[in-house]
């Protein structure tokens, strides 16, 4: 057989394989060997696992599994589960869409409040140390900027979400202490929106930080709804 014939046979097999791949993608509920899988009957997995259902009269708290999803959101999740996509494409497009809806500079979908705090802290460290956005956050913090200013009354159970990034907390209590706490190593100021304690208001916290050119992270994860509070988190 000629080399040309061999190449044609090879390309023909490749084309057939790609056609089969495309056909398989068009049938998302078929398994790997092309057998149609039966539709699963609804299962109450909380009952199956022996978990007691609760009435959430508190708010959108992580320990209460956040908030119930509306039927439209459940339908969107079910639809999205039918097709694979590149995760980076999804993150970028979803973030841009949410930013437009929320009228803010940028947005990112995270796995929850703790991961949001970690990612925001990592972003502030990366920017403060002059690392390009395309590079990973520094893992060796020796000699790098890593200080996060926080009110002592705002230290809470999610401190570890920031500590995971290798930061060092600088605790303050009064406005005077806060104004004097900034150094060349300050990368972020943290504010816990749900904390009633603390001598420094959110408005003063943001004002002083921005006067020093330092970004603020406001954990307001459990403070929406009402939707009118959304802008308070973008500082």
Residue ranges, per PLM feature:
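N-terminal export signals
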Residues: 1-32
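Glycine-rich phosphate-binding segment of PLP-dependent enzymes
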Residues: 52-86
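Flexible, glycine/charged-enriched surface loops at secondary-structure junctions
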Residues: 87-92, 106-107
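Conserved PLP-enzyme active-site core in the AAT-like
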Residues: 10-14, 39-55, 59-63, 95-106, ...
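A non-catalytic, amphipathic alpha-helix used as a structural packing/dimerization or gating element
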Residues: 76-79, 93, 97
């Amino acid at each position: 057989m000629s080399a040309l014939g061999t190449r044609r046979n090879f390309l023909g097999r490749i084309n057939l394989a790609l056609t089969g791949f495309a056909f398989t993608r068009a049938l998302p509920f078929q398994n790997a060997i092309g057998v149609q899988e039966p539709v699963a009957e609804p299962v109450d997995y909380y009952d199956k696992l022996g978990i007691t259902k609760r009435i959430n009269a508190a708010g959108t708290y992580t320990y209460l599994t956040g908030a119930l999803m509306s039927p439209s959101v459940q339908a969107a999740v079910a639809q999205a589960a039918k097709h694979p996509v590149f995760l980076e494409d999804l993150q970028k497009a979803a973030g841009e869409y949410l930013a437009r809806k929320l009228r803010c500079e940028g947005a990112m979908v995270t796995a929850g409040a703790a991961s949001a705090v970690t990612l925001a802290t990592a972003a502030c460290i990366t920017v403060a140390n002059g690392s390009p956005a395309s590079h990973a956050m520094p893992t060796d913090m020796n000699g790098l900027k890593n200080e996060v200013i926080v009110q002592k009354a705002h230290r809470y159970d999610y401190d570890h979400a920031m500590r995971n990034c290798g930061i060092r907390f600088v605790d303050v209590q009064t406005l005077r202490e806060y104004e004097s706490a900034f150094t060349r190593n300050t990368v972020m100021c943290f504010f816990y929106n749900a904390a009633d304690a603390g001598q420094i208001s959110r408005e003063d916290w943001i004002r002083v930080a921005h006067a020093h050119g330092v970004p603020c992270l406001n954990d307001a994860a459990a403070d929406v709804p009402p939707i009118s509070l959304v802008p308070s988190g973008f500082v």
